[in-house]
Each structure stands twice: as structure tokens, then as C-alpha cells.
């Protein structure tokens, strides 16, 4: 099995080393194609107006000056040659990708691009917290990643589906279990715009987050609830985002 690994944190991110180790537990034919620089939050963007620059880091290791989507396309359609990959792994992301994070995440997008190319694809993310000193406990992803991947690969992933795996911010021995979940929903009211001034007095802005005064209790069965309970969350996500129920309503309304 030929595995293509990518991420959105960049070619030098520690999580990329973890995903490569996980991949090598499954196969000895592992390739790494990752962004030259941090691409967190770029979602499924594709570079159409800028050329892609490719740099070979070492054997089967390449950096692309582009997005995670660019990396998967370059890896599958150019770097790996005619055979291409059999599996795409994206991650391990530094931080969780839960609920609405899925829309923004370059890690998820790398896996989605693999799915769009007809390849079984997984996104893996490691939560961290103040308790861990903002340092992800990579050992948790390292331990649970291979066994979960093997089981899902054996059963098979439906066409147009990507599997999103999140590991809780605790040591491996503190993990309660593995739960299959659905996407959660959180209050995005804590998004804020931070306005500052440069040395010339001109304004510039950062998008940031305000700490919530009240922590919502996540709905049962969601990825948010699983991580809060120190469980590994495994969420199958569909590429087709059509709201089938509303299709019927609109059809009746607009006919």
C-alpha cells in the first residue's frame, strides 16, 4: 500500500513526523508532500494564480510552496508518478478539528482532496490544552492512530466520505475509549477582530477568539462531547453537503 502524507502546519511541523510514523506502521511505501510554510486555516483553497514551487527535502520527502490541497494534487498527479497513492493521511494537526473547525481546516481539506481523487483518506488532529502547557501529547495520536486506521481500512470507506479523527489532550493511558461521532456545533459568538496600529499609525487586524464566560455542554454523540470525555473521536464526513430535507421544501415552494 502506497501512502501519501500531508498536513497544513508545514513541512517542519512535529505532527508531520508523527503521521509518517503512523503511516510506516501500515506500509513501507510512505511519501511526504507538505506545505513549505504553515497553512493553517486555508481550508480547501487551490493555488490558481501563483506557480507552485517544489523542493525535495530528502528521499520521498517534498515541500510545496502551496496549500494542503496543492500538495495532495502534486503528490498524487506528479511526484508519485503514474501509480499514485493508495491512501491519503493528513495531519497530525497541532490542535483539534471539531465542529465548525472542519470548514476552516487545511488538514481536513487535504483529506477531502484525497477523497475527491477517489482515494481512501483520513484527517488526524491532536488536541492540546492548558493542562499540557499548550503542548500536544503526540504519544496519544501515535498510539491510537495505527489501530484505528487499520480497522477502518479493513471495513472500507464509502465513496465520497472522509474520516476525521481527533485525539484528546491527555496521555494515552488516560484515554477513556474510541467513539464514532457526528459533527458538533459550538457558539461562534466569541470570534473577535483585534485592531492594532503599525509603526506608521496605520491600522491592521487580527482575527482572534474571546474566552467564553460560560462553557456550553456539548450535545451527546458529537465530536465535541467525545473529546471533552477524553475519548478519541472518529467522525465520517460526506463530501456531498446537500440538505436533502430542504431540497423537498424548496422544490414544493419554487415549482
Swiss-Prot record:
Residues that coordinate or bind a divalent metal cation: 8-9, 40, 93
Role played: Nucleotidase that shows phosphatase activity on nucleoside 5'-monophosphates.
Organism for this UniProt entry: Nitrobacter hamburgensis (strain DSM 10229 / NCIMB 13809 / X14)
Record-level Gene Ontology MF annotations: 3'-nucleotidase activity; 5'-nucleotidase activity; exopolyphosphatase activity; metal ion binding; nucleotide binding
Protein name: 5'-nucleotidase SurE
PANTHER family: 5'-NUCLEOTIDASE SURE, 5'_3'-NUCLEOTIDASE SURE
Entry's localization field: Cytoplasm
Origin: domain of life: Bacteria
SUPFAM superfamilies given in the database record: SurE-like
Amino acid at each position: 500500500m502506497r501512502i501519501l502524507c500531508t498536513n497544513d502546519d508545514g513541512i517542519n511541523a512535529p505532527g508531520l513526523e508523527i503521521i509518517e510514523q503512523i503511516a510506516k506502521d501500515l506500509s513501507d511505501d510512505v511519501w511526504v508532500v507538505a506545505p513549505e510554510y504553515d497553512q493553517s486555516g486555508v481550508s480547501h483553497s487551490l493555488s490558481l494564480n501563483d506557480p507552485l514551487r517544489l523542493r525535495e527535502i530528502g528521499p520521498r520527502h517534498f515541500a510545496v510552496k502551496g496549500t494542503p490541497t496543492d500538495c495532495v494534487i502534486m503528490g498524487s498527479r506528479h511526484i508519485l508518478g503514474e501509480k499514485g497513492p493508495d491512501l491519503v493521511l493528513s495531519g497530525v494537526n497541532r490542535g483539534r478539528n471539531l465542529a465548525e473547525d472542519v470548514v476552516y481546516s487545511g488538514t481536513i481539506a487535504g483529506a477531502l482532496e484525497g477523497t475527491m481523487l477517489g482515494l481512501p483518506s483520513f484527517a488526524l488532529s491532536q488536541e492540546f490544552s492548558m493542562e499540557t502547557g499548550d503542548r500536544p501529547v503526540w504519544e496519544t495520536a501515535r498510539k491510537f492512530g495505527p489501530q484505528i486506521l487499520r480497522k477502518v481500512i479493513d471495513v472500507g470507506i464509502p465513496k465520497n466520505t472522509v474520516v476525521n479523527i481527533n485525539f484528546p489532550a491527555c496521555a494515552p493511558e488516560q484515554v477513556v475509549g474510541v467513539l464514532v461521532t457526528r459533527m458538533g456545533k459550538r457558539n461562534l459568538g466569541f470570534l473577535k477582530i483585534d485592531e492594532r496600529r503599525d509603526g506608521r499609525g496605520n491600522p491592521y487586524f487580527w482575527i482572534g477568539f474571546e474566552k467564553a464566560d460560560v462553557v456550553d455542554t456539548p450535545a451527546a454523540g458529537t465530536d465535541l462531547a467525545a473529546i471533552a470525555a477524553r475519548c478519541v473521536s472518529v467522525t465520517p464526513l460526506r463530501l456531498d453537503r446537500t440538505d436533502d430535507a430542504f431540497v423537498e421544501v424548496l422544490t414544493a415552494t419554487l415549482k
